[in-house]
Amino acid sequence: MAASVEPRQPFGRLDAPATAPTARAPGSNGIRRRADSPVRGCGFPSLISPPRKGPVAEEEEDDDDEDDEGHEDWREAYGSHLQLEVEPSTRDPRDEGTADAWIERNPSLIRLTGKHPLNCEPPLARLMHHGFITPAPLHYVRNHGAVPRGDWATWTVEVTGLVRRPARLTMDELANGFPAAEVPATLVCAGNRRKEQNMVQQTVGFNWGAAGVSTSVWRGARLRDVLLRCGVMSKKGQALNVCFEGAEDLPGGGGSKYGTSVSREWAMDPSRDIILPYAQNGEPLLPDHGYPVRVLIPGCIGGRMVKWVRRIVVTTAESDNYYHFKDNRVLPSHVDAELANAEAWWYRPEYIINELNTNCVITTPGHDEILPINAFTTQRAYTIKGYAYSGGGKKITRVEVTLDGGESWMLCTLDIPEKPNKYGRYWCWCFWSVEIEVLDLLGAKEVAVRTWDQTHNTQPEKLIWNLMGMMNNCWFKIKVNVCRPHKGEIGLVFEHPTQPGNQTGGWMARQKHLETAEAAAPGLKRSTSTPFMNTAGDKQFTMSEVRKHGSKESAWIVVHGHVYDCTAFLKDHPGGADSILINAGSDCTEEFDAIHSDKAKALLDTYRIGELITTGTGYNSDNSVHGGSSLSHLAPIREATKVAGAPIALSSPREKVPCRLVDKKELSHDVRLFRFALPSSDQVLGLPVGKHIFVCATIDGKLCMRAYTPTSMVDEIGQFELLVKVYFRDEHPKFPNGGLMTQYLESLQVGSSYIDVKGPLGHVEYTGRGNFVINGKQRRARRLAMICGGSGITPMYQVIQAVLRDQPEDETEMHLVYANRSEDDILLRDELDRWAAEYPDRLKVWYVIDQVKRPEDGWKFSVGFVTEDILRAHVPEGGDDTLALACGPPPMIKFAISPNLEKMKYDMANSFISF
């Protein structure tokens, strides 16, 4: 079997128009299945026509079995083929003003080196969501500078040096003049998991997390065929190395291209499947991945695979390029930057990295994932999952997990979708899983994993630091801590070692902060930051101190380097205590700015108690979507009503969940019903009745967050719906720019656009049959007075839906007064009217509108404002068994609802809830 397959049937040609694209178009939804694809579970369209049969060049080596591959039925060999799920690409505002502003990129990629150049990795959960093949827009990126603008029609690759027939090959010649090889290969940056090393001691490299790894099917001409066509000389002719040079202009060494080399022996070895790919996953290469052509050396580190390749030079000596020597080395642990330069350690050949080492990572549970411990979860095993890979074509043969620090090991189940090439080499990652009894996890402090390959190489237990932070492959360990995800219950929260880039979170980062704080505290006497007007807070706090205050008993936050104690404000916060508690103990600068007005920002100064100590380590910013790591003090997280066994998407209120837009319906000129798919089709959203979610998006370069209540059933599997009234630009004189988020949602493309959601949020939960939990306290009501305006109907709708689904057991009476501008603006009217007619003893509905647009229809409800008379006529009077729920514009609540309910004997402190 072969991982590099010569086509055996007529294929379509890759179109090379007169003006070839400089950027790849969005991925096609119509990917055809290929019977000869060398990977189970994926299929790609063919890109080229096979050339005429005949020798590629003057053969200098016997390879009689060169053409004996590819005869079997690939459908039978690899099973059913799957379509790739589309990942969107768009112009990223973060690229504005840079040389890469023309490139479309996936917005979910985590940037590791600021705006430019792009170095990024996908979110680990998103990477694993796609399984064996990584969509090209989600593939990790390592760029040293600006991306060259490639043009298929004019691009050439020069082959020169110790060859008898130097050539300058066009892209058409590469694509149509050589047999095509299709090679599935996992690419890994040598710095994968580097941040773990940086937590011990800073290296010279940036913070790669555990997702600097991706897998694609690459298609291109074999390097061996190209060199033979050009008459590569033999070793006797001193042809010992093959050098590659890219097109980008870089600063290294005073100015150079990116270049490196491999031995001639490697380049001519047919078993190594080295190719010059021009396609990835059945599409032309993306600009970030080397369009129009690059080098692929399977089983090797990414740093050897030159992108935008322009020159291939056969030489006697290895490459003398600056990046060949000053990058991709594993130096001994005692060698620091000064010693490496002084004693020329960079040039010692024994420290160069070529083949990947053995490595594996735990991906499930995710960082900050919470496993509730209850009667349901303890009756079934919990599945731990991850990926593993090795280099040099070696097969992964074993993965083991330990719960006791290596005293005993459990063998994992391997999932190896790839078949070896005909030389027995494996170029791709595999996946592993193991089922653990929940009670065993309850007694564990950490979970560690290690892997073995076919040469019985395995991973060291402890991290081995090196100057460049390369090839980190110690046991991957996650910590297991007890928390309280539900009032009266306990749960387990899992903590990964780090989070990528400058995101905080992770047990190694927490340990680093503690050590730094202890060392720095005696010497840090005064703050150097600019004080706010409130000068009372002169104290300084470390981030580790802030993290201790993550509960409703003590809720601290950090905004723009200042520390605030918001405990006293929890009960008065308009968005409810949960909105503060999900960020308590963390730096929430970005999220605070995204949803608060200048007035709110000024109000915040009242609660300032001091400033955050910065120690120069660069890890004090807490913009991670996961928040801090002291999760034993999390606010109560209630389990949603759900189908037994269905996993919850909103497993942590601190974590953003990417959701794809799968349907959009226009209910009126400005009302839309959006349907979003959850990351996994077997998940439920996990939103309790009465709670809401934050929808998060980056708009014009800034984070925007808005609260929404889904209108779909709380136990709907795989997706959820949002009913949204779109506020368009120039429609209302008070808001000439319209609604920022609603217009953004309106612009999303069905099938390819994503939003992030987080939650559950809110201080109210309806637990059924008249029972509520309000700010953590139980409250029972037999009658509900529901008053709302506009889109404020959605939380009411959610409660109504829950009550009516539980008939006849739920005897709660609901009296709804719903205000809008006109009869055309009433949302969900058909459903409300139908329910009111079907359940007259449970639901009564009364509408109030500002103006009647169609008097001929015979409007029978109120016109004008919500008044005391209207409320007295259509909602019950206050009492111990009555609860008022309100949701609408602040003026409506302040002037129309609150004072009139107070006149109707409502206890506004205990019997009135504003969503």
From Swiss-Prot:
Essential cofactor(s): FAD; heme; Mo-molybdopterin
Acidic residues bias (residue ranges): 57-71
Source taxon at top rank: Eukaryota
InterPro entries: Cbr1-like_FAD-bd_dom, Cyt_B5-like_heme/steroid-bd, Cyt_B5-like_heme/steroid_sf, Cyt_B5_heme-BS, FAD-bd_FR_type, Flavoprot_Pyr_Nucl_cyt_Rdtase, FNR_nucleotide-bd, Ig_E-set
Record EC number: 1.7.1.1
UniProt-annotated stretches for the region Disordered: 1-102
Residues reported to bind FAD: 706-709, 723-728, 735, 740-742, 791, 794
Amino-acid positions noted as binding Mo-molybdopterin in the UniProt annotation, renumbered to this chain: 189
CDD domains the UniProt entry points to: cyt_b5_reduct_like, eukary_NR_Moco
Gene3D superfamilies tied to this protein: 2.60.40.650, Cytochrome b5-like heme/steroid binding domain (3.10.120.10), Nucleotide-binding domain of ferredoxin-NADP reductase (FNR) module (3.40.50.80), Oxidoreductase, molybdopterin-binding domain (3.90.420.10), Translation factors (2.40.30.10)
Enzyme class, spelled out: oxidoreductase
Low complexity biased stretches: 16-26
Catalytically driven reaction(s): nitrite + NAD(+) + H2O = nitrate + NADH + H(+)
Domain FAD-binding FR-type, chain residue ranges per copy: 654-767
Oxidoreductase among keywords: yes
Physiological role: Nitrate reductase is a key enzyme involved in the first step of nitrate assimilation in plants, fungi and bacteria.
Homology family: Belongs to the nitrate reductase family.
Protein's UniProt name: Nitrate reductase [NADH]
